[in-house]
């Protein structure tokens, strides 16, 4: 199982939010410095979120993200504010390995098929942000149907992987809820990366044993509640 530290960027700075709220941001400083630190500690890749894009400022941080993507030369997946095929293509052409499309994939599901046909499914990840079994879109404000049904649909449209975020536990550093993860893994064949609430090597091990392909570490990693080497050891045990 792969481990992807989150590098969430708001107004040019690395931040962590609680429950997706910008007013609850904790600022950690230079995103590039954090990216290099996590890679030096052995991360399998980076999970980059352009929060300004998610909040409607699509191109903000673009130069910064492009620069450290080129510098690090590591696997990078990116989400946040991807509202069109053109947005996604711009990031993929800039060197991002995989784009994450969430709200727009629900609004315009055929976008997944178009991107998969043009760039290959392995570079297209559908984001599934769920609360109480419902996909949440538009900043986690509006429910849009069963997360399991959407997962199956995205898979059928050609998404090469899924990012599952449990909104109920995201940013709280209180541990994962494994049941919805196992239900999702039983319904799809594509790799599933899990985000939200991962706060200990035990959480990582539970996801590994369930069959998740990867885990995104965010708030607990930056707060020092979990150390990256310990998470990596749990992720790669038995390999």
Swiss-Prot record:
<protein>
    <recommendedName>
        <fullName>1-(5-phosphoribosyl)-5-[(5-phosphoribosylamino)methylideneamino] imidazole-4-carboxamide isomerase</fullName>
        <ecNumber>5.3.1.16</ecNumber>
    </recommendedName>
</protein>
<dbReference type="InterPro" id="IPR006063">
    <property type="entry name" value="HisA_bact_arch"/>
</dbReference>
<dbReference type="InterPro" id="IPR011060">
    <property type="entry name" value="RibuloseP-bd_barrel"/>
</dbReference>
<dbReference type="GO" id="GO:0005737">
    <property type="term" value="C:cytoplasm"/>
</dbReference>
<feature type="active site" description="Proton acceptor">
    <location>
        <position position="8"/>
    </location>
</feature>
<dbReference type="Pfam" id="PF00977">
    <property type="entry name" value="His_biosynth"/>
</dbReference>
<dbReference type="GO" id="GO:0000162">
    <property type="term" value="P:L-tryptophan biosynthetic process"/>
</dbReference>
<keyword id="KW-0028">Amino-acid biosynthesis</keyword>
<dbReference type="InterPro" id="IPR006062">
    <property type="entry name" value="His_biosynth"/>
</dbReference>
<keyword id="KW-0413">Isomerase</keyword>
<dbReference type="GO" id="GO:0000105">
    <property type="term" value="P:L-histidine biosynthetic process"/>
</dbReference>
<dbReference type="GO" id="GO:0003949">
    <property type="term" value="F:1-(5-phosphoribosyl)-5-[(5-phosphoribosylamino)methylideneamino]imidazole-4-carboxamide isomerase activity"/>
</dbReference>
<dbReference type="InterPro" id="IPR023016">
    <property type="entry name" value="Isoase_HisA-like_bact"/>
</dbReference>
<comment type="pathway">
    <text>Amino-acid biosynthesis; L-histidine biosynthesis; L-histidine from 5-phospho-alpha-D-ribose 1-diphosphate: step 4/9.</text>
</comment>
<dbReference type="InterPro" id="IPR013785">
    <property type="entry name" value="Aldolase_TIM"/>
</dbReference>
<keyword id="KW-0368">Histidine biosynthesis</keyword>
<keyword id="KW-0963">Cytoplasm</keyword>
<feature type="active site" description="Proton donor">
    <location>
        <position position="129"/>
    </location>
</feature>
<dbReference type="InterPro" id="IPR044524">
    <property type="entry name" value="Isoase_HisA-like"/>
</dbReference>
<comment type="similarity">
    <text>Belongs to the HisA/HisF family.</text>
</comment>
């Amino acid at each position: 199982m792969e481990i992807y530290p989150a590098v969430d960027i708001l107004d040019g700075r690395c931040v962590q939010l609680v429950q997706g709220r910008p007013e609850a941001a904790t600022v950690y400083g230079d995103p590039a410095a954090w990216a290099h630190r996590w890679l030096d500690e052995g991360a399998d890749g980076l999970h980059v979120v352009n929060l300004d894009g998610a909040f409607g400022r699509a191109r903000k941080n673009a130069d910064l993200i492009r620069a450290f993507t080129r510098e690090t030369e590591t696997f990078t997946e990116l989400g946040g504010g991807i509202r069109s095929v053109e947005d996604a293509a711009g990031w993929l052409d800039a060197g991002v390995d995989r784009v994450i499309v969430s709200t727009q994939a629900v609004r315009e599901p055929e976008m997944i098929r178009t991107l998969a046909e043009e760039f290959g499914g392995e570079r297209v990840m559908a984001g599934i942000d769920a609360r109480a079994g419902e996909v949440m879109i538009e900043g986690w404000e509006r429910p849009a149907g069963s997360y399991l049904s959407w997962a199956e649909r995205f898979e059928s449209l050609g998404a090469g992987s899924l990012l599952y975020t449990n909104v109920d536990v995201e940013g709280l550093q209180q541990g994962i809820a494994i049941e919805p993860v196992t239900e999702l893994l039983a319904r799809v064949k594509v790799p599933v990366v899990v985000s939200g609430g991962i706060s200990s090597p035990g959480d990582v091990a539970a996801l590994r044993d369930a069959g998740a392909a990867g885990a995104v570490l965010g708030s607990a990693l930056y707060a020092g509640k979990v150390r990256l080497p310990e998470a990596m050891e749990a992720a790669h045990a038995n390999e």
